[in-house]
Amino acid sequence: MNNYYNTKTEIAYLFGVSEGTVRNWIKRTINKELNLDLADIDGDLKIIKNTHNDSLINKLIKNGRKYRQLDLKEERKVSSKLEKLLSYNQTLTLINSIEVNKEVPLKFAYLGEGADIWNKFYLSTKKGDVYSSNNSDVFLLDKQYPIIIEHFAPNQKINVVDLGSGNGYPVTEILKKLKSENKLNSYVAIDISQKILDITKKNIEKVNLGVPIHTFIADFESQSLQDILYSIKHNEQDQNIPNLILMLGSTLPNIEPQIQPLLNIKAGMTVEDYLITSNAYDKPETRTSFPAFEFEDGKELILQIPKLLGLNNENCKTEKIYNQKKGLKEFNLVLQKDLQITFPKLNKTIKLYINDRINVWKYRRDTFELINKKCKDAELVQHFTVRNPHMNQIMYMVGIV
């Protein structure tokens, strides 16, 4: 691997500037106005990849924006719909994420009518195998059912806890099987979206399980589940009922870094509890495919919050890439002009600049090595890891001992 940036285009992409700006940096270095480290490669000056250069470039960008006049700026106020949709803390999280990470968190897309869009998206993908994670979850849970049950006492009842419940469909079959064997104590759905929980509860009630159904609003990406999971385990008779926690539908791969939600879940687990999660398996030939975007509902869901922010095809172009450096797929909005976005209720304005990349979706596929590392970092023990032989999906179950 070269220790220098191959092209000006590469630098422009990584740092969100124009190629002309990169040429100007090199020219100023030649004139001894800057002290970038350069390498002469066959007569072509290249910017070397090192911490000194990266630090200086970031400083140049920051200073340039500080004093820059936004002559071509576009001013937008966020939709009143967005201000009603998000809580005060969620709005602060959104602002911080855009300013610091240049990212619109996908989790907010499931709030409000986003829940209905998600439900439509799921139902449309269920008809085929283009977007196969949900179908694979049902298959793998059924295949691994005997192994899952072996981890619980023969006559032990179980709480099924559905994290990021979606519409509840992927867990329906395992709920039926547990009920038929008199092993199901209760079903619990946890999600950031009340509307998602309403859809889930309605669908699970149709199954007629005859057990309590509970719902909790929680953002397990940033919030410890200790209190919620403890309250589920100890019912009114103060029985210690183990939790089987399911986080399906490739929920975890949309979150970065993944260690924090794992720790938030682990905080509420005891030795009797287990977590099962799933993902697509990473192969080089799949890194340029974006199956979710083959469905209009999928694109609508992902772009819902950006549109309420004023990010649209008039001021942005879209970009689907595999980020080799980060090892994940990205869907970005690339600013075509300077933009100021105002949040009237908070009297807060954020500034975005031409060529800024705003990430609105990311996805990290798994490998056995990545799973091993996640479990090691979170101090979780793997009890099984299995791949779907028909679909490119993987599922694993972990515990705290």
Task: Please identify what each model-predicted range represents.
Residues 269-284:
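Conserved beta-strand signature within the Rossmann-like core of class I S-adenosyl-L-methionine
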Residues 1-25:
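Polyanion-binding surface elements
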Residues 245-247:
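A conserved beta-strand element that flanks and buttresses the S-adenosyl-L-methionine
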Residues 282-370:
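SAM-dependent methyltransferase
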Residues 253-265:
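A short, conserved alpha-helix within the catalytic core of class I
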Residues 65-161, 168-216, 224, 234-235, ...:
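Rossmann-like AdoMet
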Residues 348-401:
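C-terminal lobe and adjacent flexible extensions of AdoMet/dcAdoMet transferase-like proteins
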Residues 31-68:
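Short helix-start
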